[in-house]
């Protein structure tokens, strides 16, 4: 990773089975399993009797309450049935972004194809939900109320393009932010490392940007948490559109 800024984003096969089909276990699958394991381990290791009486319990309750209030504010009282899914999704994204901050780790959220495919499946699920609840009335979402008849074709086209772009923008926003932040950290860290190894003067000068790199790392932690929340709140907004048609 010292010589290639993009090496940390490469998917590498760890175990390959060649038969009629090529099956492989790669580092992406390994990190997905790691994130899921960390998610469920944190729940099982937390003693419910002491929930709220230690820092870990207070933090978990704060996250739980934040996502619950977000879902209720987006979808009202009927949104409670979607809360378990939204909380699980937020926790998965949050843990994945935090794990990717480990040195020499693998940035799952920076895999554009995987994240966009995931967001596409979520968007398609919202469309199916709207069709199952409202039938053909779901397409009333693309015609705002009070629209003059002459403008209906144009607005339907615009609304269709806007609604369809959600499938890509949902994952693209997350992936682009994580990718850019990790690249910036790696490039500045590599520059500082090479500068300190060049000469004694370079070694002394290499300490100057340390505070800047630390600030970027702290900012990237905040961005990882914020992007997990943004991903969740946008998806809850899309679900609200499918349920209430507005």
Curated annotation (Swiss-Prot):
| S-S bridge residues | none
Task: Give the CDD domains listed for this entry.
Answer: ATP-synt_Fo_a_6 (cd00310)
Propeptide position ranges: 1-3
What does the UniProt entry say about where the protein is found? Mitochondrion inner membrane
Classification via InterPro entries:
ATP_synth_F0_asu, ATP_synth_F0_asu_AS, ATP_synth_F0_asu_bact/mt, F0_ATP_A_sf
Its topology with respect to the membrane? Multi-pass membrane protein
For this UniProt record, the keywords arranged alphabetically read as follows:
ATP synthesis, CF(0), Hydrogen ion transport, Ion transport, Membrane, Mitochondrion, Mitochondrion inner membrane, Transmembrane, Transmembrane helix, Transport
Name the NCBIfam families for this protein.
ATP_synt_6_or_A (TIGR01131)
* Name the record gives this protein: ATP synthase subunit a
> What is the organism field in this record?
Debaryomyces hansenii (strain ATCC 36239 / CBS 767 / BCRC 21394 / JCM 1990 / NBRC 0083 / IGC 2968)
Q: Which gene encodes it?
A: ATP6
């Amino acid at each position: 990773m010292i010589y290639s800024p993009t090496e940390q984003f490469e998917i590498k096969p760890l175990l390959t089975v060649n038969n009629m089909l090529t099956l492989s276990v790669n580092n992406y699958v390994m990190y997905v399993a790691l994130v899921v394991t960390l998610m469920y381990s944190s729940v099982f290791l937390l003693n419910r009797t002491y929930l709220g009486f230690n820092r870990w319990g207070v933090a978990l309750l704060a996250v739980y309450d934040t996502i619950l209030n977000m879902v209720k504010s987006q979808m009202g009282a009927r949104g409670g049935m979607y809360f378990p899914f939204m909380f699980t999704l937020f926790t998965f994204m949050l843990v994945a972004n935090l794990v990717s901050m480990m040195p020499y780790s693998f940035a799952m959220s920076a895999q554009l194809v995987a994240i966009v495919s995931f967001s596409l499946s979520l968007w398609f699920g919202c469309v199916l939900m709207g069709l199952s609840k409202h039938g053909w009335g779901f397409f009333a979402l693309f015609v705002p109320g009070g629209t003059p008849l002459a403008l209906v074709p144009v607005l339907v086209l615009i609304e269709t393009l806007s609604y369809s772009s959600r499938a890509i923008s949902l994952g693209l926003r997350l992936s682009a932010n994580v990718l850019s932040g990790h690249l910036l950290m790696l490039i500045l860290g590599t520059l500082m490392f090479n500068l300190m190894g060049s000469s004694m003067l370079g070694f002394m000068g290499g300490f100057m940007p340390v505070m800047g790199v630390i600030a970027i790392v702290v900012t990237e932690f905040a961005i990882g948490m914020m992007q997990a929340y943004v991903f969740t709140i946008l998806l809850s907004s899309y679900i609200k559109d499918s349920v209430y048609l507005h």
